[in-house]
């Protein structure tokens, strides 16, 4: 992992897509004026946009910057860029992909259809293009359903951005399935409670990592997220390579950019244990599956002690304790 040092398309249309520009002559699409509706205007990197009632954080701008930078570099090297923004909020991330990364197409999805008018107004700053070759489309459904529909219709994407809340790992497999080979997967976790080791059984269920309290929980949170993606990809016979990771204390927010390709992991060095001693502060990493044989005998010979050393398997094994 580097901590910030960074299929074939078919012509079948999406059956679940809405018209991104409502019919102005339809009474159901007219803008309803309501005193309870807020129209908040913001500016990010020179782009003006509305937030409305959608969830938006100024502090997440750096994470969006990194996503746009990776997308722009991908477009420069591949000469194409199709993006799926699975949880787009007010649409500023999708707008920046269109304007700054010059994406050929962006599918902006958000499950909350109350945000539709705001998203469409923001994206309308970029000409939509023709019906045959649109630049952007807006949908309002579950992100997993959108990605699964795209996968079934062989509508693959070069970059999929999943800016999710908490530690919802259910997005991992649908996102990997809908991604083009050699594509980029931008994942998010905001579950600082689990990465801090306060819910080890929750992190085990979500990412296959049994996490205990450690002084470097920010790094563990990033590794936990990457490890979950590596495991899901390996089940599908795919290989994940981390390009960069980003941590921010607000939230907190863990973001990782991954490249997904054909081929399984060449060895078991990606499966490791991390140990930490609360007495002396020493930390150790045991690489490979042989670490089970290296650490387990010591644990069996020593009494379990909360003041001793514990080992954390980043995938499936409970903590292993030994005396410091």
Predicted features along the sequence, with ranges:
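SAM-dependent transferase fold signal centered on methyltransferase-like domains
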Residues: 2-324
């Amino acid at each position: 992992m580097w901590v910030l040092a960074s299929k074939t398309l078919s012509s079948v249309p999406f059956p679940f897509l809405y018209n991104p520009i409502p019919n102005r002559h339809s009474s159901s699409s007219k803008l309803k004026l309501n005193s309870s509706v807020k129209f908040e205007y913001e500016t990010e990197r020179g782009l003006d946009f509305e937030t409305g009632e959608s969830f938006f954080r100024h502090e997440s701008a750096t994470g969006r910057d990194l996503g746009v930078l990776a997308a722009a570099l991908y477009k420069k090297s591949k000469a194409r860029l199709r993006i799926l923004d699975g949880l787009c909020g007010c649409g500023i991330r999708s707008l920046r992909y269109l304007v700054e990364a010059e994406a050929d197409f962006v599918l902006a999805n958000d499950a909350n259809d109350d945000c539709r008018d705001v998203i469409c107004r923001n994206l309308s700053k970029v000409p939509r293009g023709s019906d045959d070759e649109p630049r952007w489309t807006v949908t309002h459904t579950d992100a997993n359903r959108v990605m699964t529909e795209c996968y079934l219709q062989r509508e693959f994407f070069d970059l999929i951005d999943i800016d999710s809340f908490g530690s919802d790992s259910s997005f991992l497999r649908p996102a990997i399935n809908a991604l083009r080979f050699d594509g980029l997967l931008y994942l998010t976790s905001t579950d600082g409670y689990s990465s801090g080791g306060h819910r080890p059984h929750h992190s085990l269920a979500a990412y296959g990592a049994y996490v205990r309290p450690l002084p470097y929980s920010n790094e563990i949170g990033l590794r936990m997220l990457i490890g979950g993606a590596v495991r899901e990809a390996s089940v599908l016979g795919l290989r994940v390579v981390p390009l960069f990771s980003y941590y921010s204390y607000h939230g907190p927010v863990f973001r990782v950019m991954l490249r997904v390709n054909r081929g399984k992991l060449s060895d078991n060095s990606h499966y490791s244990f991390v140990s930490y001693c609360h007495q002396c502060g020493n930390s150790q990493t045991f690489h490979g599956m042989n670490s089970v044989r290296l650490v387990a005998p010591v644990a069996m010979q020593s009494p379990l002690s909360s003041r001793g050393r514990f080992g954390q398997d980043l995938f499936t094994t409970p903590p292993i304790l030994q005396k410091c």
